[in-house]
């Protein structure tokens, strides 16, 4: 079972997201245990202070080291992965999600204000960012990471095929999806999906996935392993796009 402990000054933010859908089912099945801790419970002064002014001056407040150290020390085990959600961390992606899903215990520390005291870095194992933009705190990044990681835990998703076919699972974007009706306001489902020819459908889906990736996220093609068929399909795609111009 994967255990995830989240340390935050706003525990109420996590009440909704973890009580519905796949995250709730994963907990109900006993595959994942998620607990949220209020950082203020690890303070020792009557005001439950978690932040203070920065040395050297500057705007904003900085999260104090003492409560974070105390929280981590009370929760940490030998095999714990202690993660600080930080703009300066490694950019979160599917590969990191897969790595974390294989861990036994994750501790997520949600930063706030102008950041955390630099000395906190001495007790964490990695820093993670979810993107190059500014957020109010680490709570939303923590939710993103938990959602991405939990769905990869064996047994969480009912259909293993859905996990294998998802975007990024094979390093590229997913092929287009269609459902009923067959014709909606003149927009029709591609005939090949109605052909019943599984090999042609498979090839069409792979080609469409490669095309979408080539047009929207070409950087992904440089990072993934492509088969000979993929390379041939990409040449077809490039030729077709040139002919459209």
UniProtKB/Swiss-Prot annotation:
It comes from the Bacteria. Keywords: Cytoplasm, Methyltransferase, S-adenosyl-L-methionine, Transferase, tRNA processing. S-adenosyl-L-methionine binds at residues 111, 130-135. GO terms for cellular component: cytosol. It is found in: Cytoplasm. Its main location: cytoplasm. It catalyses: guanosine(37) in tRNA + S-adenosyl-L-methionine = N(1)-methylguanosine(37) in tRNA + S-adenosyl-L-homocysteine + H(+). GO terms for biological process: tRNA N1-guanine methylation. One of its GO terms (molecular function) is tRNA (guanine(37)-N1)-methyltransferase activity. Its EC number is 2.1.1.228. It is an enzyme of class 2 (transferase). SUPFAM superfamilies: alpha/beta knot (SSF75217). InterPro entries: Alpha/beta_knot_MTases, tRNA_m1G_MeTrfase_C_sf, tRNA_m1G_MeTrfase_TrmD, tRNA_m1G_MTases_N, tRNA_MeTrfase_TRMD/TRM10. Belongs to the RNA methyltransferase TrmD family. Specifically methylates guanosine-37 in various tRNAs. HAMAP family: TrmD. Homodimer. This is tRNA (guanine-N(1)-)-methyltransferase. The gene is trmD.
